[in-house]
Amino acid sequence: IHIGGAYGDKKATLERWIDNYYKLDSNTQMRLTVENDDKENMYSVKELYKGISEQCGVPIVFDYYHHKFCTGGLSERDALNLAIKTWPKGITPCCHYSESRRKEHLDESIKAQAHSDLIESTICRYGHELDVVVEAKHKELAVLNYKY
């Protein structure tokens, strides 16, 4: 889940989110994850860690591409490590990977956050075992064409 809107007060928004989280049944709570946002004024991995994971233990799905837009002052490696820290022992952390459609098509009119058709770069896992969800317009074809 993307926390999304800050509504002018990130702290209060996170508190409301946590209040609502505790209204969910335990089966739903066990399956819930949060993901870092792709806009600078939204939620970084660091903000999710302090505002959600430390409070109620919800794991963070690290999105590599979103991190480029909303770093929270952390390097990619540090943000990934912080997200991994939120996952329960024995569960492989999940992350999302996508690339820029704007760069792929050399077209500045394309929205900066738009996903590319295929994946061209090597996904840097920094030595971690991860379940990587590829987010690309060509779906399975992007996975089949990926060179690692």
Predicted regions mapped to residue ranges:
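Conserved, mostly hydrophobic/aromatic
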Residues: L32, D63, V132
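Active-site-proximal loop/turn and secondary-structure-junction residues that shape catalytic pockets
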Residues: I3-Y7, N36-E40, Y64-K68, E99-R101, ...
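Histidine-acidic metal/acid-base catalytic patches
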Residues: V58, F69-Y148
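Active-site acidic/histidine proton-transfer and metal-coordination neighborhood
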Residues: I1-P59
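Sequence-level detector for tyrosine residue identity
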Residues: Y7, Y21-Y22, Y43, Y49, ...
